[in-house]
Amino acid sequence: MFGAHANDIYVTQSGDDLDLDITQDGQNNQVGNSTTASSVIGASATIDIDQVGNSNVLKFDVNGANYTGTFNVTGNSNDIDILCDSTGNNSSCGTVTASITMVGNSNDIDLDIGETTDASNTTATITSAGSDDSNVVAATIDGVSAILTITVDGDTNNWLLDIDGDGDVNGHTYIHTHTGGIADVDVVQSGIYDNMVTITTSGDNHDIDISQTD
């Protein structure tokens, strides 16, 4: 009988203009682990991570002025935790473009941007690319201008979104499109300028709560 094998990658990098590509194919693989994130500190970072398989862990912490992250996850029961500006180093993740695409069931995804200091500009997308069920997605974005777009296809999914910060003249924007049944969506959006939430849903047994404050 053969035991289950896993690949582990730990990244600790300091410096400008990083271009990092990681691909893991298999199960029980890790980039960082459940308690310690891989970390990058620098003025500019482009990160592309693909994980294929079940029960993988991806925990990554980025601090820098400009950050582009692309994360693709295919499989079930994966734990994804993407952090930006946990320590407030090096311009506090000023301009952020983040894209997370998942295909699979029972995944847990956390996206946290501007944890210590507001991010200046954030454009983030989270896409469920198939009929994906029983996923939990939490996104917390603190920033001056945030655009978050979520596209969901599947049943029994839970979405927890918190967007705050002063906002610029355009405020914050949240666009949510969902096809499927049994959805729990909680949106908290705040800022001193105009904020917009657009939700389009199709399916039964949806529980949607939206809170907007200046």
Listing of model-derived features with the role each one plays in the protein:
Residues A6-D214:
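Low-complexity repeat regions of mature extracellularly deployed or surface/particle-associated proteins
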